[in-house]
């Protein structure tokens, strides 16, 4: 199913933005179940549960249920991961402080760049503090870890940042 989601963008402008997005999802993991049937059952329950969620008026962007839920889960995972969680997640308070310091007196900025963007929490905090329309040319980031790079891209999509408004690269910032 994840490959079908990626393939749905083939031939469109967003093709490269979705390519490899779910590469790190291991649907054969024993953590999902000891047999293929049990793993499939859990995945079906998950996808059906997401499909049945009442997300309110998503089209008017009055809520950000997926994005907020994702951030919450990332926060919980990072805090449980201890020191290693800092490799991919900047705490919300730190992100907000950095954003406010970097944008003092500004109501609009050209772009936001994070050279070690992790899951994208700092990039998205700039959007929350200034507003999506105040960031004219989008969000840019680099992340060396492929798994974290994909987390960032998923995070952008879940926060309704269009594929044409962000450019996240899986690269070493220092090279």
What are these regions (language model features)?
Residues 1-106, 164-175:
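Non-catalytic, mostly N-terminal accessory regions of nucleic-acid modification and defense proteins
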Residues 84-175:
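Conserved S-adenosyl-L-methionine
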């Amino acid at each position: 199913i994840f490959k079908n989601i990626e393939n749905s963008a083939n031939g469109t402008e967003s093709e490269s933005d979705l390519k490899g997005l779910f590469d790190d999802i291991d649907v054969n993991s024993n953590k999902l179940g000891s047999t293929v049937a049990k793993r499939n059952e859990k995945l079906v329950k998950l996808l059906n549960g997401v499909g049945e969620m009442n997300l309110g008026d998503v089209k008017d962007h009055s809520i950000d249920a997926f994005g907020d839920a994702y951030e919450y889960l990332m926060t919980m995972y990072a805090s449980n991961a201890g020191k290693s969680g800092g490799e991919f997640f900047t705490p919300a308070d730190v992100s907000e402080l950095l954003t406010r310091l970097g944008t003092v007196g500004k109501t609009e900025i050209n772009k936001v760049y994070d050279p070690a963007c992790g899951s994208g929490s700092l990039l998205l905090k700039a959007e929350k503090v200034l507003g999506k329309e105040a960031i004219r040319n989008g969000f840019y980031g680099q992340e060396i870890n492929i798994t974290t790079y994909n987390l960032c891209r998923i995070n952008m999509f879940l926060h309704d940042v269009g594929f044409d408004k962000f450019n996240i690269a899986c690269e070493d910032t220092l090279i």
